[in-house]
Amino acid sequence: MKRLISSAIAVTASVMFAITNIHAAELEEIIVTATKKEESLQDVSVSVSVISGDKIQEAGLHDLKDIGQYIPNFNVSENAISTIASMRGVGVGANQSFEQSVGLFVDGVHLAKGRQFRTGLFDVERVEVLRGPQGTLFGKNTLTGAINVISAKPEIGGDFGGQISLAVEDENSANIIDGHLNIPAGDNFAVRLSFKDREDDGYITNAYLGTTGPTADEQMLRFSASWQPSDDLRIDMKHTDGEHVRVGSTVVQKTFDMAMPPTPTSGLAFLVAQNFFPSFVANVGNYVGGEDLNTGATKGAMQTLGINPVGTQTNTSDTAINISYDMANGMNMKATIGNAKYDYVDGIDADFGPFQLVSRDDWSEYEQDS
């Protein structure tokens, strides 16, 4: 009896040992640079979440606003004039002159303005989200946290080849094509070309125009080069150009008020619409759905009204050079040189009526060196 029990224990122990080895082989160590050096995610002392480039492509995440759906306590929101990043519910206002309280770092270069958070994601190795003040390692404008985006690098000594992927989204009638090509040149130099083209027709119907929105057109192109002349020295360079155009808004029209007595704004809008766009007035009543106010469609109907939807166009250009040198005393010296610039034009229908009586155009240019 004792011999049988001993055999059973031995068999159980061996099975458990085998299962443990299988799980150990399946687990992949995640390396991050949240503390300015390469460490295992398990050893990092700060609160950090990581999402890989493969997951970003698999989930169809196009920008940092989409990343917020997967990362706890992180959110990026957009309004007509600005982009606001917040961590744990804390952010800055919509004033475009403000710098964000959440620092954005792309390949080591700090991008301080909210408009730069609209930069699309493509050919990314990983995105690290650090929660809490990060001023000690990342400097100012990281009061609530930091976002560390690491682009995919050329593979020195790797194979010549690449990848192209095509995605189609039925609900938004969106088409996305992206890819990259790795070109090795010798044993210590390689080049990587990557691109992304995205067209999104939107999911809200404009009842007057018969079109959908908000539409988004995005094109991005990146050139990367890596040179490793010795085991101690490596230089990585990348340059990215991008264009982002969006027309329309998810805001539902709420100023076309036919209730009595009419307000000055709604009365003027109705007067103009009745005389210049009579079909608009008829269209409003067709699918208000029994509301007391003829304010257009409800959010539930996923429809909006308007002749001149708001629009925005942003052009970006970013360059980063990273130099890493392992010194003889075991220390590592790193240097980052960067240039980032953008320009944008925003068109806003300020009267919110069917006829664009009052409009406003905003434009700006920005450039930084670091």
Over which residues does each language-model region extend?
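N-terminal Sec signal peptide and the immediately downstream disordered periplasmic leader
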Residues: 1-59, 65-69, 182, 231, ...
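Acidic, small-polar-rich N-terminal luminal/periplasmic segments of exported/outer-membrane proteins
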Residues: 25-156
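Short polar catalytic/cofactor-binding loops
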Residues: 33-38, 169-172, 225, 241
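Outer-membrane beta-barrel translocator/receptor signature
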Residues: 85, 100-101, 113, 122-125, ...
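Periplasmic-side early beta-strands and strand-to-turn transitions of outer-membrane beta-barrels
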Residues: 156-158, 167, 180-271, 342-357, ...
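Flexible glycine-rich, low-complexity coil/linker segments exposed to the extracellular/periplasmic environment
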Residues: 261-306
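Outer-membrane beta-barrel transmembrane strand signature
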Residues: 295-324
